[in-house]
């Protein structure tokens, strides 16, 4: 009798496991389709953020808080972030991505550092703000992990692993909690092989109301410009 019971359990698993996978795939396709529809309407977004950088070797967390904004211009995306505090201490700094370059401004040093951003940065910029489901599926293997409520919003939890040759080798995987109806992520966790991770939580999100003037750094007189 025990043997037949075990056989029934195995048979049930063989039957229902594929059905569960099909159901998850159907939910994922629904999420990606909603993101496609929302992405078409996306123009800009701004939000408050909390970034938690975890360093595994010393088991420490570094928290930064501030505001961030994104804007779509043609086929490209611009981003500006204003860090206000570091571990709750005032530590203003600004980061601007525009025209393929990253500008890092440190007011306390009166220094602007300009870097070539590289070819893959926009894949990460659009990962949670205005990116389409089609683009997401083109660059990542996506595992649908159900829904979770964040800040009163039902989000789809997606785990992303890099596709081979997609240029996403900086991270082992990324987990994001996305509101597919707005193509906006409310939370992201980025994991590296070293064990380091970065968690970003976004709140007070406003869509399609960011002026173009926001995507420029306000440099103090006498600021030194360094290009690397």
Language-model-detected regions and their locations in the chain:
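Bacterial N-terminal signal peptides that target proteins for export
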Residues: 1-11
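Sec-dependent N-terminal signal peptides of Gram-positive bacterial secreted proteins and lipoproteins
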Residues: 13-16
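N-terminal mature ectodomain segment of secretory-pathway/periplasmic proteins
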Residues: 26-104
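Secondary-structure transition/turn motif
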Residues: 83-87, 106-110, 161-164
